[in-house]
Amino acid sequence: MKGILGRKVEMTQVFTANGKLVPVTVVEVQPNTILQVKTLETNGYVATQLGVFDKRENLVNKPELGQFKKANSVPKRFVKEIRNMEGFEVGSVISASDIFETGQYVDVTGISKGKGFAGAIKRHNYSRGPMAHGSGYHRGIGSMGAIINRIFKSKKMAGHMGHVKRTVQNLEVIAIDNNIMLVKGSIPGPNKGFVTIKANVKGLSNTQAAELLVRNAPVATEAPIEAPVVEEVVSTEE
């Protein structure tokens, strides 16, 4: 498992090599610094801690500053470890092109946009009631169960919506250039939100597999037609 940290910039659209217009998310992936390498013998599991985007020293406490100095690095704003990522040394720097390549599929994890306190219709896609003047309710939750003295746990009701960790899987990498990565489709979070990009863990859907098969199919070329060889007949008659 390999991954890298970045920051969402915006969404736009680009044309592919075959002329297809696809929506993409622009992700800023500055070089990541390896802050710590965890091994099975020392920590009980394998992981690599990454850091990206510099931060002033007066914004970190002494224990955090000591950890950054061990890696010969300045303080970082976004620090996260990725499990089962090994083969790197503390203090080294990696870029997006070292981890991924164009055409590869990745999983992107981020914090979704917060919506605040939302009703059941917005939060759980409930149907609203009749909107006529004689109806008893319009956007109410309605019945909450058949037992009158209690409400079951996990009942879908109004409450806090958004601002949770979400992962979008199997997104295609359209391009990587100059610390910028273009990922097909949308990713969680607002603009300038931090995201974690890792190699995909699940297989592709039928549509994605078909597109990949068509894109990697060899181009058929016609072989040149050779002219037939005409043997010269020598006459022996005088």
From Swiss-Prot:
Query: By its UniProt entry, which SUPFAM superfamilies does this protein fall under?
Result: Translation proteins
Which UniProt keywords are listed?
Ribonucleoprotein, Ribosomal protein, RNA-binding, rRNA-binding
The UniProt entry's sequence similarity note says: Belongs to the universal ribosomal protein uL3 family.
Question: Which Gene3D superfamilies has this protein been placed in?
Answer: 3.30.160.810, Translation factors (2.40.30.10)
Encoding gene (name): rplC
How is the quaternary structure described? Answer: Part of the 50S ribosomal subunit. Forms a cluster with proteins L14 and L19.
For biological process, the GO terms are: translation
KW RNA-binding (keyword) present: yes
- What PANTHER family does this protein map onto? 50S RIBOSOMAL PROTEIN L3, LARGE RIBOSOMAL SUBUNIT PROTEIN UL3C
Asked whether the UniProt record includes Ribonucleoprotein among its keywords, one would answer yes
What Pfam families does UniProt report for this protein, alphabetically? Ribosomal_L3
Q: Name one GO molecular function term.
A: structural constituent of ribosome
Give the protein's biological function.
One of the primary rRNA binding proteins, it binds directly near the 3'-end of the 23S rRNA, where it nucleates assembly of the 50S subunit.
What HAMAP family does the annotation carry?
Ribosomal_uL3_B
Q: What protein name does the entry list?
A: Large ribosomal subunit protein uL3
